[in-house]
Amino acid sequence: MIKPEILAPAGSFEALTAAVRSGADAVYFGTGNFNARRNASNFSGDDLQRAVDFCHERNVKVHITLNTLVKDSEMSELKESVRRICKSGADALILQDLGVLRVVKDICPDIELHASTQMSVGTLDGIRNLADLGFSRAVLPRELSKDEIKYLCENSPIELEMFVHGALCMCVSGQCLLSAFLGSRSGNRGLCAQPCRLPFTAENGTGHDLSLKDLSLIEYAPILSKTGISSFKIEGRMKRPEYVAAAVMALKNSLSGEYSSENSEDLCSLFSRSGFTKGYYENALGRNMFGFREKENVTSATTSLLKKYERIYEKERAVYRVHFVLSVKSDKKISLTASANDLSVTVLSESLPQKAVNRPFTKEEALLRLKKCGGTVFSFGDADICIDDGLSVSAAEMNALRREALLRLADRLKERAPYRINKANIIFRNRKPNKKPQTYVSFRDTSAIPQNVECDKLFIPLSSKPELFEKYSAGAVLPRGIFGNFDEIVKRLIKSGARYALCNTLDSVAAAKKAGVQIIGGPFLNIFNSVSLSEIQKLGAAECVLSYEMTLKQLTALEGECRRGVCVYGRVPLMLTRNCPVKNGKSCRECGGKSFLRDRKGIEFPVRCTNGFSELFNSRPIYMADRMSEVKNADFVLLEFTTEDKEQISSVLKAYQNGSSPEIEFTRGLLYRGVE
């Protein structure tokens, strides 16, 4: 059994030092603007090279996060960032955006690629898709149960990584728009403002019904290591160095069978939200998973506790046992060879050794000098010593030779074979857009579909009766959450007779492919630039609804052949959750499928459930009927009906036919203001 890697966060150089000296096998951090924690200190310029060298010298791998969506206007900056990272010798890149994937593969085809949890892939066929795209590792969603994790590990063609400690988002990663729509700070762009930690209340709920406790599975590490997981990931690039050190130490202790209540108490004191949860892993969803940062949580980290972990990482940690070969010959310069980790260096004295006047240099004295490796990444292993009789070597000269040898050996440890670095030259073939975009309409509730709907394509949920697909010549909207449910989704899709499917994740793309149904990309594939649009076409999408986070200006400038559309009406799904927030206050029977959460301002956000997942919708629908002339370079527009009744739907459809001004409370979404 291969021991899983301990992968620690590094939001600053001090946190990186804490991770490395506490015993992490690898660290992950961001650089520049293209990472999911843009508010962390991160690393750029000389700091990036310094960080990579620091880690490599200590036999620790470096994974760089490039896991955000990128605008077309940022592509030049992205390419420069990729070149800089690859020149630094980093070991792997963690990616979300399909366009970024293409750019990285063009520039540096040899660097290892990891699929971020932001890609929302949690099925075996989705993981196979990632392998085909060139990923060697996938980071699993936090929402998976132990049985689902075990199944994926047993069958995955690539390495799998999972979170074992840290913050737990309410929403499936990569599927959250709450921060973007409430304040233009996009989680998909590394600037999540965490509005979910503010009061959102279900009827009879906790008052913080979108705020989960932090995850902690560290005590299960020995069991999980037997499943075949390749990497245990600790969340926390915004956390203090002491937190990082404590989490790494606790995970090391757990893997060696030495995990204790002290480890757990320290972690809870350093950072928690009303304690920790194992809910998804144990498939024990419910009210006990929820928690928020109370006053006692904030003040529980004492000075003595912080000092305890500071002492662990403030001193250098020996990583390698060094073997010395010392040769002191009368007719040659003194030679000292130092070897570790299959590397060797040799240093020579400036002059020949002198004849001893009083006491000659001995093996015992040489050993005394060679053993002084403190403050370096080396500890003394052994030594082969050959000294001619009657020679003198001063303590100062011997110490200088040892220091020089260890410095040179440390430099050798930093070295990596350079990557091939190419120019990225992506050329687009453009299509001729329709003079007037086609109209696509999606209905969540099939009983609310008006008679004689005029549209070019009509979508209904996959759970609808097969005769409805035939009646409306409808396409199927595949569920966004299909973890542990993939084969059933494929069977249902085949049985439905749907000719096309709206796919919002790479999991659902894989399901549509398996069912032999035409793929239409959905907005939660997060297609945000011309390159990603081109890449989703290569994956089989005939056309694609663009990300809800794109502006009309970005849409107008978008290049490429793939037919593209934009949502011009509907309540945007702000969250996809595997733990229903409404259940904090009432049962499914009491809910009746028409519940909501209320924020601290009294605004209501509808909640609807399907396929074992809940969706939180925006309080107001996007409305663009009176501004359709401003929607340019789109082949189709999408109207999504979720909470509306038949009469309301008929009224909206008529308004779009007539270009009417709104008579309802509405939003323009992000079509004008965009995201940071």
Task: Specify the residue positions occupied by each region the protein language model found.
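Glycine/small-residue-rich interface belts in oligomeric ring/scaffold proteins
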Residues: 43-47
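Surface-exposed amphipathic alpha-helical tracts and adjacent flexible/coil segments at the periphery
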Residues: 1-22, 26-37, 49-52, 58-86, ...
